[in-house]
Each structure stands twice: as C-alpha cells, then as structure tokens.
Amino acid sequence: MKRKVKLKPKAKRAGIIFLAVIVVLSGFLIYRVWSHNATLAQGLDYIQEQENKKVKELSSSLKDKKNAEMESAIESGQVDVFALFDDAVIFGDSRAMGFSVYHFFPESHVLASSGATIKDISNWVNQAQSMNPSLIFFSYGVNDMGLGLDSEGGYDALYQSQIEQVVKVCPDATIVVNSIISATPAAIEKSPRWDKVDEYNKKIKAMCEKNDWIYVDNSEICQNGNADIYQADGVHFLQPFYTTWAENMIMTVRKQ
C-alpha cells in the first residue's frame, strides 16, 4: 500500500501564504490594468473634447472672419446688400413699405400696408406660402403701441400666434423679427403711447428666444430716436436709412 504523504504544518502555511500572495498580486495586476485602461479612456475623452473645442473655436473664428469681410464689402459697396434679400420677404407696416417704395425690394416681397399691426399678418399668409421664401422678416410696432395691443392678453403671445400661422405654411423658413424702432422724442411727446418701445421690445426678444427665432436689435442704428434718419413726422424713415437697416438685419442673420 502507498502511504499518504502528510504535509507538515510549516509546509501548509507556506502553501497558503504563497496562494495568498498569488491572489493579491493577481488582484493588484488586474487593478493596475483596469486603472490604466480607465485613465487611458479618460485621457482619450479629454483629447477628443479638446479637439472638438478647437474645431468649434476654429469654425467660430472663420465665421467671424467671413462676417467681417462681408460687412466690409457691403460698407465699401462691393456687395449690394439688397441682393442678399433675393429669397426673402418682409411683413410689416408703412415703415416696411419703404423697402418697396424706394425700390430696394420688389413690391411682391413686401407684405405690408399703411397702418398695419401684427393682427394683419394673417392677411398675407397665402402670398408667403406661394413664394415659400427662405428668410421671413417681421417689422411692426408703431401702430401696435398706438392701439395698445399689449393690453389684449400680452403682446408677445399675440405676435407669436400670428407668426405661427406663417411658420405653418413656410416651415423651412428662417424667422427674423425686428425690434420696434423708436420714434423721435418730439413725435413721442405728441403721441405718448409710442414711449413704450422698451417694454414692447423686451417682450419681442423673449418671444424670439422662446421660439428660436432671430431677434434684430435696431436700437443702435436709430440711436433711440435721436439719429438723423427720420422724415419730418419723426416716425417714418428717410431713404438712406433703409440701406443701414437692411445691413443690420442681414448681418444679424449671418452672425447666428
């Protein structure tokens, strides 16, 4: 018969210690590999994030450069600003009518009438649909303030509901809404309701932000009613201003 070999206590302990060391070392090595992979993944994510950031910054920088070049070309007369509105229409009142009256826009591209308010937008929806422009501008306000339309449940809500009728038939168009251009101080003195420009514009801007529409701030080009751009009535504009206004609109769109 073969005799069973009995390990001495010291040999057993040594074997157990050896196995324990192997387990610990294996665990350590596994942890190191996992930790290395995790660190590597984090590093790669960081590198990718920085690369994406650089691409965005470069894209933004190139866009800014192109816009600066375009602005310079427009100001120098190398580019006709009104040619950039070939596929655009503008809804509005008598102020907007100036674009066709002074022959800057074709009459069919100016969906406006004297004394119009935002409530008249619906009158032009069918024409907008038939033209299907890529850019749709809106410019109202003087008559709206005169009639106190903000008292009818909120000017911004009313304006939005009107624009949505246009969006429904021209879903691919970019929507651009002008701030109300202030009348002169003398004109406001005669008609105090026109003094609510800031109040109305705040609502127009909030409406645009809510709906992802483009808001055009015209306060600088009219100098809050003090610029030399007005006809004798202090409300309507002289012919040269329409070029300035068009530049402000199109450059605002390009900078988005």
Where are these regions (language model features)?
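Second-shell loop/turn segments in exported
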Residues: 111-115, 144-153, 166, 189-194, ...
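A short helix->loop->beta-strand "cap" motif at the edges of active sites that frequently abuts
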Residues: 170-174
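Conserved SGNH/GDSL esterase-like catalytic core that processes O-acyl groups on lipids
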Residues: 75-158
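Catalytic His-Asp segment of secreted/periplasmic serine-dependent ester chemistry enzymes
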Residues: 37, 183-256
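Alpha/beta-hydrolase-fold catalytic nucleophile elbow
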Residues: 139, 178-179
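Charged helix-capping and loop-helix junction motifs
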Residues: 152-162, 194-200
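N-terminal secretory targeting modules
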Residues: 1-85
